[in-house]
Design a protein with these regions (language model features):
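Nuclease catalytic cores
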Residues: 25-73, 154-157
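Accessory/regulatory regions of helicases
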Residues: 1-14, 277
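A non-catalytic, helix-rich entry segment at domain boundaries
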Residues: 64-155
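Metal-dependent nuclease catalytic regions and adjoining charged, substrate-binding loops involved
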Residues: 199, 212-339
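Short amphipathic alpha-helical segments and their helix-coil junctions
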Residues: 15-19, 35-48, 186-192, 255-263
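Mg2+/Mn2+-dependent nuclease catalytic core
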Residues: 150-257
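Short coil/turn segments at secondary-structure boundaries
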Residues: 42-44, 53-55, 77-82, 148-157, ...
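Hydrophobic (often cysteine-bearing) scaffold residues that line and stabilize catalytic clefts
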Residues: 53, 57, 61, 126, ...
Length: 339
């Protein structure tokens, strides 16, 4: 199949049921990281207004890459200088990909003021500060247009596909590209501080979900490459090792089975780890307002300032969950009365 004659199937939602459970990769990932945090969010309905430099900057960089790709798909030459000036100094408003409502992006200048300490601090993992990493990002922006092998054919591609009875997978894929042989590449942007280690690349569940979606959306094309693009680091990694699709299928099914088991039993055991520090329900997370970060009593005491502390605030006991949650409610009531 030659480039330029891609057929996008429109039948990917035909078999979905209103009664089916819908899972985006972020929801699956949250359960995998910590079933208790999954429960607090998706079962109990606690949706905090999260704000952090990593989150806001990541969204901004995704939008910049999206605008460049859209221009290329439309056969236009992106005005890189204008794009950079707009996002650095002015900010940007545009429709949200999910709701269609206006989405507002602060300028990078504004983010630098809002998160001044983080913005200029050298990164303990990769070295350069965010300010320095942005220079890497903008220097690499024309690389997509100059790629001699791969051409972008879809960006922020929505999907909603039936996976197994009662389960629907949905989401957005950052970018799909095609080469001269008609083969496809799935690209996912990462604004992480460091690249993945080999263990995360062997069986990447996120790329497997996207593989299923692209296979359904482009049934006549073969997917030959799965790429993580670390946009702040100027580095790329290929996901998947030999036999990874079968392993990922097994991994996804086990994860869905575990979610169903927790739903049946009503028990969602926590998995305390250093990841707790970035969880919106953890008391050590400085980026969550209100009292959401008081909801979990089982968090790890690890912080970036205390990296050797792997103790937990409270040990999980299935028989004492009600008592622990009652104590959380009392603490929240005292907090609300005090403030």
């Amino acid at each position: 199949m030659s480039k330029g004659v891609v057929h996008i199937s429109n039948n990917t939602t035909a078999q979905t049921s209103p009664q089916a459970s819908r899972f985006a990769y972020t929801r699956l990932s949250r359960f995998n990281d910590c079933p208790y945090a999954y429960r607090l969010r998706y079962i109990d309905g606690n949706y905090p207004d999260e704000s952090s430099l990593a989150l806001e900057l990541g969204n901004t960089l995704h939008k910049i890459k999206e605008l460049v790709s859209l221009a290329l798909i439309q056969g236009e030459h992106p005005d890189y200088q204008s794009i950079e000036n707009t996002f650095r100094h002015v900010g940007y408003k545009g429709p949200d990909k999910s709701s269609g409502k206006e989405e507002v992006f602060l300028s990078l200048d504004a983010l630098a003021l809002k998160y001044m300490d983080e913005w200029y601090a050298p990164d303990p993992d990769s070295g350069p500060s965010y300010r320095e990493k942005l220079e890497t990002f903008f220097r690499a922006l024309p690389d997509e247009e100059n790629d001699p092998e791969w051409t972008t054919i879809a960006v922020e591609l929505p999907f909603e596909i039936p996976y197994r009875p009662g389960v629907v997978l949905y989401g957005f894929i950052d970018k799909v590209q095609q080469n001269q042989d008609g083969e496809l590449r799935i690209v996912d942007y990462k604004s992480s501080k460091k690249v993945y280690d080999e263990s995360k690349l062997k069986t990447p569940l996120q790329l497997f979900v996207y593989h299923l979606a692209v296979s359904a959306l482009f049934p006549d094309c073969k997917i030959t490459d799965y790429l993580y693009d670390f946009v702040l680091l100027g580095q790329k990694q290929h996901g998947g090792s030999k036999g990874w699709l079968k392993r990922a299928e097994t991994k996804l099914n086990k994860l869905l089975d575990s979610i169903e088991d927790c739903k049946t039993s009503g028990e969602y055991p926590p998995k305390p780890s250093p990841l707790c520090h970035w969880c919106p329900y953890c008391a050590t997370n400085p980026n969550v307002g209100s009292s959401f970060n008081m909801l979990c009593p089982y968090f790890s005491l690890w912080t970036p300032q205390d990296r050797k502390n792997f103790s937990v605030n409270r040990t999980y006991d299935p028989d004492l969950v009600c008592q622990a949650e009652e104590e959380v409610k009392q603490s929240m009531a005292i907090h609300a009365f005090t403030f």
